[in-house]
Amino acid sequence: MAERSAIEWTDATFNPWWGCERVSPACAHCYADTWARRYGHDLWTPDRSRRFFGDAHWRIPLKLNRSAEAAGSPLKVFCASMADVFEAHPELDEPRQRLWSLIEATPWLCWQLLTKRPENVAEMVPWGDPWPQNVWIGVSIENTAFTFRADLLRELPATVRFISAEPVLASLFSPARRRRPLRLEGIHWVIAGGESGPRCRATNVEWLRELRGACVSNGVAFFLKQLGGHPDKRGHEKAVLDGIRWTELPAFPSPASLTEVAA
């Protein structure tokens, strides 16, 4: 676990395990696979075992929770950068239950759960309506073939529902046969970005502009992570769109404010 993350839209990352099966075009140049292979791990097919961690690893979020409570300020935790928590892999039932218990034990951590498998979420989480206030749920959407994930996301009673449009591989608003434009009703936050890395696919800046415009029109927080492989990218301007650096975050309650309301 990284107690402090280099990912701009979170504070820390926690991976209950490593590995998952690729399920869509966004997975083609998976950075997590590349990273794992550096350490000799081949984890990205359904027949491979996942990589698991010991008790010391699982205690780190408890330490972070104590620090956040002492500071009176919640911390955002991205889960998982090296896996998909909602993958239906036979080895994952037990560690997934351990994760739910950990989330419930750390109310000062805002758990940012990002998945490409929203169809599995309702069955796998142990909570009814409402969910714990510190659970955020997000889906990855790279083109209009996967805008259905936003429809499934809207059905989930999370404090924050978000979309990760990174990498953006096409317009998310141009209708095509059997595909629907993205709708942002019921969504609180959008993270957008082009693909990075040596084999990155180019992102048209117009796709990012129309996504930003839709967020502004719908009152959705917009966070631009990077332009990625777009030819207009210039060093420090990698996350600047039309002269503005977009780093908006969604509104969310802290445990302290919830306690005050209950009192």
Over which residues does each language-model region extend?
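N-terminal [4Fe-4S]-dependent radical SAM core
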Residues: 1-76, 84
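Auxiliary Fe-S-binding modules of radical SAM enzymes
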Residues: 1-18, 22, 39-42, 175-263
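Homeobox/homeodomain signature
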Residues: 4, 10, 48, 75-76, ...
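Small/flexible residues
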Residues: 6, 50-53, 118-119, 151, ...
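General N-terminal targeting signals
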Residues: 31, 94-96, 154, 239, ...
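Generic structural signal for short, solvent-exposed loop/turn connectors between secondary structure elements
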Residues: 40-43, 48-50, 55, 127, ...
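A generic alpha-helix propensity feature with a strong bias for hydrophobic helices
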Residues: 49, 64, 170, 253-258
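Conserved AdoMet/S-adenosylmethionine-binding subsite of the radical SAM
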Residues: 57-223
